[in-house]
């Protein structure tokens, strides 16, 4: 349900979030100067933390590797759709599937299905741009003639009215203004073939919140995302070893 995509099955539009994819108190000293210095130190620390996060997070309107980020959301969902349900990275509870079918310079962190909080451990090659789903929804045409405009309206309604409490931290530092990281595909796209060679590729539209990150420095990092879809809390923690 959440940090991934919304598969068919539940909710007023027949969707379940996937999931890609189930964040001083100053002592009142006698010496006012000491309090001022402590306050200044806290302010500078907060400023440094914000600057550090801002240097990692890529704005949603920025082009990444010659593609708008809405196209990267399509690529993420097509990556997820290529797996059978029981082998999907979205169903992975440990991180064992984090490297499955990853290719290119953008590395997808799979969302979760919302059934329970998930913590995954994953080794990520150095130099990879990270694509992190927070929460998203997918509308599929099934075997019907696709009505892309109508499907896009339903997907947008799901995100606008059913999603709340967005949160993301990188190494304990909050990512601000997650609302600005909403991506919608608008046009229909092929979600891929999985059932049989004779299957017709399902057309789909998607809407949701995703965050693209600059390659992280080598070493351990923790990314945590949370959201709520209707009354369902969604929580995924990624413990990454960049090397």
What is each model feature region?
Residues 192-194, 198-210:
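Aromatic sugar-binding surface patches on proteins
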Residues 17-34:
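Bacterial N-terminal signal peptides that target proteins for export
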Residues 43-46:
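N-terminal signal peptide c-region/cleavage motif recognized by signal peptidases
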Residues 236-241:
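C-terminal edge beta-strand
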Residues 106-189:
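Extracellular-facing segments of soluble proteins and assemblies that are Gly/Ser/Thr-biased and enriched
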Residues 52-97, 242-243:
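N-terminal segment immediately downstream of the Sec signal-peptide cleavage site
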Residues 228-235:
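Short acidic/polar inter-strand loop motif in beta-rich domains
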Residues 128, 217-220, 224:
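A glycine-anchored, Pro-Gly-centered beta-turn/N-cap motif
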């Amino acid at each position: 349900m959440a940090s991934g995509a919304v598969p068919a099955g539940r909710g007023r539009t027949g969707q379940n979030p996937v999931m890609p994819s189930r964040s001083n108190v100053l002592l009142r000293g006698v010496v006012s100067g000491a309090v001022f210095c402590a306050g200044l130190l806290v302010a500078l620390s907060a400023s440094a933390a914000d600057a550090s996060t801002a240097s990692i997070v890529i704005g949603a309107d920025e082009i990444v590797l010659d593609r708008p980020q809405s196209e990267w959301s399509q690529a993420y969902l097509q990556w997820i759709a290529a797996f059978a349900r029981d082998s999907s990275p979205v169903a992975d509870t440990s991180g064992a599937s984090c490297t499955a079918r990853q290719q290119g310079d953008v590395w997808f962190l799979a969302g979760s299905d919302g059934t329970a909080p998930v913590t995954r451990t994953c080794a990520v090659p150095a130099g990879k741009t990270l694509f992190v789903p927070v929460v998203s929804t997918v509308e599929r045409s099934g075997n019907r003639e696709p009505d892309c405009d109508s499907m896009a309206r339903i997907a947008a309604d799901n995100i606008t009215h059913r999603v709340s409490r967005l949160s993301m931290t990188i190494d304990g530092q909050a990512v601000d203004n997650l609302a600005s990281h909403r991506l919608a595909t608008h046009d229909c796209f092929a979600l891929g073939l999985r059932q049989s060679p004779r299957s017709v590729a399902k057309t789909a539209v998607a809407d949701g919140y995703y965050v693209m990150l600059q390659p992280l420095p080598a070493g351990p990092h923790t990314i945590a995302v949370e959201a709520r879809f209707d009354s369902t809390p969604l929580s995924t923690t990624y413990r990454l070893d960049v090397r």
